[in-house]
Structures are given as C-alpha cells and as structure tokens.
Amino acid sequence: LFIDTANKDNMTPQLGDFEATNPCGEQWLLPYESCNLGSINLANFAIKGKVDYERLKEIVRTATVFLDNVIDCNRFPIPEIKEMTLKTRKIGMGIMGLHDLLIQLKIPYGSDQGRDVASKVMKFIRDAAEERSIELAKEKGPFPAYDSTLNTYQPRRNAALTSIQPTGTVSMIADCASGCEPYFSIVMVKHVMDGDRLIMVNRYFEQVARKEGFYSAELMS
C-alpha cells in the first residue's frame, strides 16, 4: 500500500490526509473514520455462459441503499467515530466468488480473458453503485463533508463506494472463492476450535467427478 498515492485520490482532502486503513487494508480511512462493508457473491450471476448484468445491477443498487442505511442504524463506540463516519458516509461494496463466476463461464482464472471479465464486472459494479449513490444524494442529500467548491465530482451520498475485502470466513459460509482470489486447492481441511476437521470440497470439481465417474469418498478425503 502506498499512502502518498492513495492521498492523491482522497475524495475529501479538506478533512485531512489518510492515516490508516481498516483491519484488512481494503479501505483507506481518515482519523476516526469507519466503513461498512458488504460483498456480492458473483457465483450467483452466471446464466447460460454469460454474466447476468441485469440482475447484478439490481443487486448492486439494493446493496448500496442497505449499506448506506447501516450507517444510520449503527451504534458507534466513541463520539469521534460517529462524527467522522456520518461526515463521509463511506461504504465498501466488494465481491467474492469471482473464480466461481469464471469457472461457470469456462474462462481460466489469470487468463487475459479472465482479467477482462474481472475488469468489466468491477467497473459495472462501481458505475452502478455510483449511479445509485448520486440518486440517494438527490433524495437525502450528499455526504455532509461534500464541498462543491473543492470536490469536482457529482454530489453523491457516499464518499467511498467499493472495496474488495478478503471474505475469508464469509466465503466459506457462501461456499465460494474468497474475494477476488482463485481457489488454491480442490479439497481443503478446516480445523475448528473444538478439534474437529471439516473437509471442504470444491463443488465444481465434485460435480465433474460425479459426472465423469471417478468420484469417491477416499478421493475427497
């Protein structure tokens, strides 16, 4: 992470420079800022070998409203965090299941085509979130720190919109690849606190194994 580069793109320079990130490093923050995060599971947006952009836009727009509402429903640990969070109203909409999407599209992760799809999908998410945030600014007002004399971008509800989180735990619950990362193993073993071992099998591999007739419990363990 390069803090000087990040500060060049600071959306609210009138409030000061970035000094930190949130715990996983995906969102730059001013002193006392916080950010509400959420992840869209891209595994659910493949249809007939293509990305279902119509449904994806609907979900992004809904998620933008939900994440913005969380700010107002939140309980903040100290007054300074509440004050800064309400000033900038940052949200961080991310993804998980990118590799799942590419598998369903039959596109290798890391290929030129795979990178093109990832870029197109994230730009689409970013644009749809910005569009909805601009609409929310017209309905409820822009984030309070917005200054039309300093900020050249169109008024919007949230100073930040997208952020790619690792989703290491929630992706396990959703049974998809974490964040924008590839699957690093076909079969994984998760050791839980009570000493149990959970065997986690890649569902796409299991489907192929069953279809081609080489599936067995021994293979999966």
Which residue stretches match the model-derived regions?
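Long, C-terminal-biased catalytic regions of enzyme "large/alpha" subunits
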Residues: 1-221
